[in-house]
Amino acid sequence: MTSDKNPYKTEQRMGAVKAVSGPVVIAENMGGSAMYELVQVGSFRLVGEIIRLEGDTATIQVYEETGGLTVGDPVYCTGKPLSLELGPGIMSEIFDGIQRPLDTIYRMVENVFIPRGVQVKSLNDQKQWDFKPCLKVGDLVSGGDIIGSVVENSLMYNHSIMIPPNVRGRVTSIVPSGNYTLQDDIIELEYNGTVKSLKLMHRWPVRTPRPVASKESGNHPLLTGQRVLDALFPSVQGGTCAIPGAFGCGKTVISQALSKFSNSDAVIYVGCGERGNEMAEVLMDFPTLTTVIDGREESIMKRTCLVANTSNMPVAAREASIYTGITLAEYYRDMGKHIAMMADSTSRWAEALREISGRLAEMPADGGYPAYLSARLASFYERAGRVTCIGGPKREGSVTIVGAVSPPGGDFSDPVTSATLGIVQVFWGLEKRLAQRKHFPSVNWLISYSKYLNALEPFFNTLDPDYMRLRSVAAEILQREEELQEIVQLVGKDSLSESDKIILETAKVIREEFLQQNAFTPYDKYCPPYKTCWMLRNIVAFYEESQRVVAESAGELKITWNYIREMIPHIYTGLTEMKFRDPQEGEEANVEFYRKQNEEIVSAFASLLQ
């Protein structure tokens, strides 16, 4: 993480190590240092960040293993905060928590472990990019204005090169179209007599949110391709979601489904303190996964950036990895793209805060976590949202944050979970009981919620004017089933009224055929909105028609649930086969199939009454 200028200049400020406690180092003679300034500790020049200042003593959290540091070792000040290199070449790259490219380090040292104090450029500054300018000499520009674009890869076709948010001036020279590296100056600006050159990349401090022109309200859904999420608990692009769940509930599978099938332009996946083998699985799986864009099959790595920070890496880097991920997401958002950021898992980040807080002898709060836990979580989640970007041309972008939470023993009253639930707008609660029954995605439909339903109503009404009613009927059936289960366990199913039997049977269809989804089949790994809508409509039509014929028949001609099952078994079986329609067959053919099925349901029940 070296600065653009040489950090080893002779007049560089230097302190000395006074005490070491795990990842926390106390240094003296640090007068003139700033909070969150980047420092290099010891002869290995380990990367660290100042987190407390008292007199001329600084407390530093070190992002690398501190074994071997001794009292009196030098501490070099860089005069800069922890910053990222932002430019073309981020997508399909794998970084660690402080944006060091793992692949480059592996090729450099030929060892699977990262050596301490390794200094390497975050982005490949030798690779040439095909740059097409869109400004001319004499133009007045300010932060966020688009200079031109490069083709990052076949999915990220238009990577906009922007003026950094804190720069302005008049264009005095700009390069013509052609191939340039990240080292080349591509534009010169003059402001108040000072000339500044800009490259294809710029640096931005991770703890500072990138400025926006205005925040907008989200009104377009984040489509995940998972029916239970899209139909019952939808999120908006620019929303905040939490996925709490115990070990083995399928958090990572939902995260991967979002990466593969969500309607985002790019995905930033942060593995924060996860097990090494889980992260290895993601690193091995993602390059082999493909998505179909405009009829072409492309690797999803082309629109994904991985920030890998496993549980055996130093704890301090977990906090950095979360901020690294959100800063990368904001950079792509400023181009006018819709970005999904997965943080897996925020509990491990909170544990890192707890450990460092303990070493700083701060007063612990609930569960040993520091008192500022919820403030830190809030400042992270607040960086999500749909925004109008600064600069011209006018464009809108969004960052959606999906944070996985791993409460110990699946206990949702854990301080991290409760703090997260006070902040996020969508809660997808995973349940161990459902996962053990092999019901995936194991989202508990009784405790999960979304506060975006009203905001998304206009979108769903364009999909189907009746959609919101169908959704609430389905949710009501599932709620009633839960109440009836207690009665069934006491006195058996036969004692229920015919109306209640219909509720139980319909709920079973909703649970097993609609909410359950197999991520490993071609027909069910992704469910487009029209298929979700028609499946829901046909199930609700069956339920409402059943209730109607039972209510309208009377006396000796009273129609029972068993009679319905015997007389029109093909209709009931048809409901269980709806999900086997492959979206590859095309929307028109599938909609026609579901429409015919809907007509069959209505006519079959009409014939029952006759």
Swiss-Prot record:
Cellular component GO terms held in the UniProt record: proton-transporting V-type ATPase, V1 domain
Catalytic activity: ATP + H2O + 4 H(+)(in) = ADP + phosphate + 5 H(+)(out)
Annotated EC: 7.1.2.2
Protein keywords: ATP-binding, Hydrogen ion transport, Ion transport, Nucleotide-binding, Translocase, Transport
GO MF terms, alphabetically ordered: ATP binding; ATP hydrolysis activity; proton-transporting ATPase activity, rotational mechanism
Similarity annotation: Belongs to the ATPase alpha/beta chains family.
Protein name (record): V-type proton ATPase catalytic subunit A
Organism: Trypanosoma congolense
